């Protein structure tokens, strides 16, 4: 590798809007903020919202007279 052409790979602190913080390594060089992390994302917490698709289908059928 050529010397002095690669960015510094430093430890940065990532803070989430839910209050969770963790450290990782990055070339960004400064601490940064994210809106969603694994501690608060619905996929990882198991609190997923179920979309009412049956209600939408019924509304469509009533509106267009199908079924």
Curated annotation (Swiss-Prot):
Zn(2+) binds at residues 16, 18, 37, 40. Its cofactor is Zn(2+). Keywords: Metal-binding, Ribonucleoprotein, Ribosomal protein, RNA-binding, rRNA-binding, Zinc. Pfam families: Ribosomal_L31. GO terms for cellular component: ribonucleoprotein complex; ribosome. InterPro entries: Ribosomal_bL28/bL31-like_sf (IPR034704), Ribosomal_bL31 (IPR002150), Ribosomal_bL31_A (IPR027491), Ribosomal_bL31_sf (IPR042105). GO terms for biological process: translation. One of its GO terms (molecular function) is metal ion binding. Binds 1 zinc ion per subunit. Part of the 50S ribosomal subunit. Binds the 23S rRNA. Belongs to the bacterial ribosomal protein bL31 family. Type A subfamily. NCBIfam families: L31, PRK00019.1, PRK00528.1. This is Large ribosomal subunit protein bL31.
């Amino acid at each position: 590798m050529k010397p002095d052409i690669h960015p510094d790979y430093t430890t940065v602190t990532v803070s989430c809007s839910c209050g969770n913080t963790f450290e990782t390594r990055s070339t960004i060089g400064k601490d940064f903020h994210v809106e969603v992390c694994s501690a608060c994302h619905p996929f990882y917490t198991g609190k997923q919202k179920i979309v009412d698709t049956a209600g939408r289908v019924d509304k469509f059928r009533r509106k267009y007279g199908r079924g």
